[in-house]
Amino acid sequence: MGSCINEEKLAKFFQRSLNALPAPYTSGLPNHLSLIFFVVSGLDLLNKTDILEKEKQDIINWVYSRQILPSKDNPEINLENCGFRGYNFLGQEFCCDKSVHTSENGPLEYDLPSTPNTYCALLILRILGDDFSGVNKKAIIDSLRKRQRESDGAISGSPNVGDYDLRHLFSACAISFILDDWSAINKESAIDYIKSCLSYEFAFGQTPQQEAHGGPTYCAIASLSLLGRLDVLEPFKEQLTFWLVKKQITGFCGRTNKDPDTCYAFWIGASLMMIDRYDLIDFASINAFIGSAQHEAIGGVAKEPGQLPDVMHSYLSLVGLSFGNIPSIQQVIPCLNLSKRAAGKDWFEKLI
């Protein structure tokens, strides 16, 4: 089966988005690395990375400029604040060709890394063929070590910030897998936290006692997959499967009694892929729904038909289509959200 989207138009949409974004994206600049990841990985899935050949080294340099390192004079200073930030903020010197070392006085107050930005930075570098020689792996792992809460195993997104939830636990697991160092995470405590987020619907909320939602459910299952502990799902796997399959209307929705949204082709689709139940859904309907949400003139995919497209929905829709084994789209490793081509044999074999 072929895709219902115009792949050439989508590739041009990603290419334009790399160079300029409309004003509404301004509020997303704290997560700028995720926007670049959507574009770069989207072109990778479409087999169009040749488009990036001229800009490739500039993108790699830009990603490294987002890295926050320990003090150059004393590597033990500021270990809790290392990783990748999304973008430059007030008071931080703009520098587009080298990573930033913090001063002896510590980091600027609002210049913080986050686990999602670090995860996206590492994936961008992998897709573009970087060898990670500029990544301070020790500093990232040492910083990550300070993020896990002892009381329940939850992990925060940034140093001294109280947003503990499954998004950041997943990002931490992905970072640990990518850097091949799990020493920062108490695995059993992390698994206990995942279990605590299970709702009465037998899917997962973002934090304990929250409504089951497609995004956190993906984060929970992907974390367990990276941890090698999908067996945790066995006692309620059939109920979880039922909840996931029932999210399909034409496309998937993310919560019970909500309208379909193209991004859940990834969140729900990848969850079903990881538990080996994707054969239970109607892929032709998913394909058609995504095709109907592609903007004829702009080329990107919106959250639903008739809306304006954006890079997130365009990318996650494309990943959702990859689960249908469409020949023109690269296959994706669901638990990493990365093409098998970019992952390479070394990462892929560790996940089998």
Curated annotation (Swiss-Prot):
InterPro entries: GGTase_I_beta, PGGT1B-like, Prenyltrans, Terpenoid_cyclase/PrenylTrfase. Pfam families: Prenyltrans. Zn(2+) binds at residues 261, 263, 313. It catalyses: geranylgeranyl diphosphate + L-cysteinyl-[protein] = S-geranylgeranyl-L-cysteinyl-[protein] + diphosphate. GO terms for cellular component: CAAX-protein geranylgeranyltransferase complex. Its cofactor is Zn(2+); Mg(2+). One of its GO terms (biological process) is protein geranylgeranylation. One of its GO terms (molecular function) is protein geranylgeranyltransferase activity. PFTB repeats lie at residues 135-180, 187-228, 236-276, 283-325. Keywords: Magnesium, Metal-binding, Prenyltransferase, Repeat, Transferase, Zinc. Geranylgeranyl diphosphate binds at residues 213-215, 255-258, 264-267. Binds 1 zinc ion per subunit. Its EC number is 2.5.1.59. It comes from the Eukaryota. Heterodimer of an alpha and a beta subunit. Belongs to the protein prenyltransferase subunit beta family. Catalyzes the transfer of a geranyl-geranyl moiety from geranyl-geranyl pyrophosphate to a cysteine at the fourth position from the C-terminus of proteins having the C-terminal sequence Cys-aliphatic-aliphatic-X. PANTHER family: GERANYLGERANYL TRANSFERASE TYPE BETA SUBUNIT, GERANYLGERANYL TRANSFERASE TYPE-1 SUBUNIT BETA. This is Geranylgeranyl transferase type-1 subunit beta. It comes from Dictyostelium discoideum. The lineage of its organism: Eukaryota, Amoebozoa, Evosea, Eumycetozoa, Dictyostelia. The gene is pggt1b.
